[in-house]
Design a protein with these regions (language model features):
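C-terminal, well-structured catalytic/ligand-binding subdomain of enzymes
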Residues: 1-94, 115-118, 123-269
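A gly/proline- and charged-residue-enriched helix-loop-helix capping module
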Residues: 91-104
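Phosphate-interacting basic helix/loop segments used at nucleotide- and nucleic-acid interfaces
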Residues: 105-115
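Conserved catalytic-core segments centered on acid/base and nucleophilic motifs
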Residues: 5-7, 102-106
Length: 269
């Protein structure tokens, strides 16, 4: 389960955030890097307790050289013939140069083959959008300033067979409330670590059936991109690693090596 969202901080300043929740208490990210795109690889086996069975495909979150950011959140693995929605995040970043062209790329993709139900979040230097994916259909919500989603559809509607029917609505409420008053990266970091539920076991930071295993903030100001990433529960006091994605004008083999060696993931050490 995941909580995702966007926030515009100024005319040339914006961010995308994600808390990644898994059916286990730890996880090691895999990275894809090229001159054009950086992506944290998606995994279709997020609910499994056995990491040896993980199947990676697509991107869970990423950015491209044009300053387009995209991430996703699971709703349910329906239809049965659907493909992993992480592939749509990769398509958006490989084929899109901005939010609108990325939406068109996703629409073309679901027209060719159905994908599992999910929420995608996109932001660029002008606007942001949430794409709700429902098999071979999509629905769009646009907002210039801020958006958030969890693990159910708002435009298509929640369903009893959704993967999370327990925490998704409360997490959305908590995220919306905090995002309304957010005006800095520090506010988003506070949101990611928050426990606003009465029993403190969940909130945006999740300690319930699913555990928050990574927190991400992709940030752009005046064309300069950075990735703030933290492994483990964000309320635990662990620090964010601030990395410069080596894409576009920043691309070099040395930059790629530095990014990989600095990224908090046991599998990359």
């Amino acid at each position: 389960m995941c909580t995702i969202g966007t926030l515009r901080l100024g005319r040339h300043e914006y961010l995308l955030f994600k808390n990644k929740d898994f059916g286990r208490d730890s996880f090691a990210d895999q990275i894809f890097l090229s001159e054009d795109v950086v992506g944290i690889q998606g995994v279709s086996t997020w609910a499994n307790s056995d990491s040896s069975q993980d199947q990676f495909s697509g991107f869970s979150i990423g950015a491209n050289r044009y300053g387009l950011f995209c991430c996703d959140a699971n709703v349910r693995e329906e239809p049965a013939t659907g493909w992993n929605y992480d592939l749509l995040t990769e398509i958006a970043l490989r084929e899109g140069t901005d939010v609108e062209s990325a939406i068109k790329a996703v629409d073309r993709a679901v027209g060719r083959h159905p994908y599992w139900c999910s929420n995608l979040m996109l932001v660029d230097g002008v606007t942001s959008a949430a794409i709700e994916v429902h098999g071979s259909e999509i629905a769009i919500e646009r907002h210039t300033e801020r958006l958030t989603r969890t693990n159910h559809h708002l435009l298509f509607g929640a369903r009893p067979m959704d993967e999370d029917t327990i925490t998704t609505e409360s997490r959305l409420s908590f995220s919306r409330e905090r995002l309304t008053n957010a005006n800095s990266i520090e506010d988003i970091q506070g949101l990611q670590a928050s426990h606003d539920s009465n029993d403190k076991t969940t909130g945006i930071c999740n300690h319930s059936a699913h555990q928050t295993v990574y927190s991400y903030i992709l940030y752009c100001k005046d064309g300069e991109m950075s990735l703030l990433v933290r492994q483990g529960r964000p309320c635990s006091g662990s620090v964010y690693h601030c990395l410069t994605p080596p894409i576009g004008n920043q691309w070099s083999q040395e930059g790629e090596a530095l990014f990989r060696s600095s990224y908090p993931s046991d599998s990359l050490v």
